[in-house]
């Protein structure tokens, strides 16, 4: 039996008249359609009308559409809105940058930025290995892709690969406390990708090659870039 998945979760806002027992109608229809109800909330309640948000997991997008259509077909219900919970989670992306140090006073600013930061720059210029100790480099990974082999979806290109790279970066942070950032390149040329990684390498302690079809990048990076990498 095919299982429902939170990856296809939807929230449907439905309204109906209380005397017609809309909650019973909603649960009956969704159960009949083979979905899994995970939440049911009363959003509005009046004497002559009740608005209910029902959240359920579907099998796939087609199944979600079928559930919505079945609710819409009921003579005692009116579907107001359908929200795809996965799309909602991705609104605005899944990552953000936050400062590790407070910038509350002039003293804070003077040490974190100018003029104090100049001494840090000079120290690294004198001994480049200090970059790992005094910057984000030692705990930062670039998640690099050209979008040529995105999950099981094929060659979707760099923009469409970005949600996957955001997710990989979130996993780095959650499970290893490593700061990772997506780098989606608008090229599928091996030399251009390797050269780009070379150019951005000063910022990162590691490179994660993700969802890239060609296997040439690994050996090329080994020979050209002094940096940790993973595929």
What are the roles of these predicted feature ranges?
Residues 216-231:
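Single conserved hydrophobic/aromatic residue that forms the stacking wall/gate
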Residues 7, 139-142, 224:
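Short, hydrophobic/aliphatic alpha-helical segments
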Residues 45, 151, 226:
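Conserved protein kinase catalytic core
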Residues 43, 67, 84, 156, ...:
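A generic "cationic amphipathic patch" detector
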Residues 1-91:
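A conserved regulatory-domain signal marking ACT and ACT-like small-molecule sensing domains
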Residues 49-52, 78-215, 219:
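Metallocofactor- and cofactor-centric catalytic cores in central/energy metabolism, strongly enriched
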